[in-house]
């Protein structure tokens, strides 16, 4: 696959685009845990801040991307980071009523 090829050729995995997004934060929208795990295995930082100081885990929780949230937590994402508004991933999951993500975050140490 093209992503793996680019990573193997030394692509800088934590670069941000003009909108302050990393490859990992963009991968969250695809809800592809294999892509997320690949990026992390090549050094992608699962806690790197993006737009509005949102981590990939906060984005996954806000968007209801359970598979992404799970892969990020397995890859070392911090469950209690806050965004620009002071919300955590758990706050977003609760606000959007994504119960499976709420439970996942709590199981992985999110402060409730």
Which residue stretches match the model-derived regions?
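Eukaryotic tandem repeat interaction scaffolds
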Residues: 17-21, 25-35
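Ankyrin repeat structural motif
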Residues: 1-7, 32-40, 65-73, 99-106
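Leucine-rich solenoid repeat scaffolds
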Residues: 80-112
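Ankyrin repeat A-helix N-terminal signature
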Residues: 26-32, 59-65, 92-98
């Amino acid at each position: 696959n093209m992503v793996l090829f680019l990573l193997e050729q030394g692509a800088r995995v934590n670069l941000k685009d003009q909108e302050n997004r990393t490859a990992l934060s963009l991968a969250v929208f695809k809800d592809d845990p294999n892509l997320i795990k690949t990026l992390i295995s090549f050094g992608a930082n699962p806690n790197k801040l993006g737009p509005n100081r949102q981590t990939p885990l906060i984005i996954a929780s806000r968007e209801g991307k359970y598979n992404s949230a799970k892969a990020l937590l397995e890859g070392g994402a911090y469950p209690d980071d806050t965004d620009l508004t002071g919300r955590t991933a758990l706050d977003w999951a609760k606000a959007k009523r994504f119960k499976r993500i709420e439970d996942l975050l709590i199981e992985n140490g999110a402060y409730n």
